[in-house]
């Protein structure tokens, strides 16, 4: 494929994606919110799972289960 044809193909694909994003703003926003929520839950699990506990107060905001802090999702 020549350089000109490649450039035209890339331009067409970019314009098609731009039109899709304009037509579907709710879908794009909803997906971003889900991803953000998922990342915060993973950080919470990692933070809680690395700690040991003897009482529930040791794990705030997590819970103490069998001597380990956990966060049930």
Curated annotation (Swiss-Prot):
An MF annotation (GO) of this entry: ion channel regulator activity
Primary location class: secreted
Assigned keywords, A-Z: Cleavage on pair of basic residues, Disulfide bond, Ion channel impairing toxin, Neurotoxin, Secreted, Signal, Toxin
N-terminal signal peptide: 1-23
A GO CC term attached to the entry: extracellular region
Disulphide bridges: 48-62, 53-64, 59-69
UniProt family annotation: Belongs to the conotoxin P superfamily.
Protein's name according to its UniProt entry: Conotoxin Lt9a
């Amino acid at each position: 494929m020549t350089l000109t044809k490649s450039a035209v193909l890339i331009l067409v694909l970019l314009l098609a994606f731009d039109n899709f994003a304009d037509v579907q703003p709710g879908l794009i926003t909803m997906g971003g919110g889900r991803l953000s929520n998922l990342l915060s839950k993973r950080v919470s699990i990692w933070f809680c799972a690395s700690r040991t506990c003897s009482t529930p107060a040791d794990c705030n905001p997590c819970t103490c289960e069998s001597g380990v802090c956990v966060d049930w999702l």
